[in-house]
Amino acid sequence: MVSIINYKSDNGMTAVIKSSHYSVMLYVKDKDGNIIIDNKPYSGVISAKNALRKLGGNWETIEE
């Protein structure tokens, strides 16, 4: 089973964290649609969320 969490920051960036039993991947776009992080693997969801914090801005989950 894959869990998908969508995020948006106050500076216009969007992100998706996809997690399964085997991996956690992070995908981030800036406000212009340019890819910043393209499916980079992380050891866990917390590590991926920490990577979002390092990009700056206030991140919140969004419903899709």
What positions do the PLM features span?
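Short N-terminal "domain-start" leader segments
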Residues: 1-29
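Mixed-charge, Lys/Arg-enriched low-complexity segments
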Residues: 3, 32-64
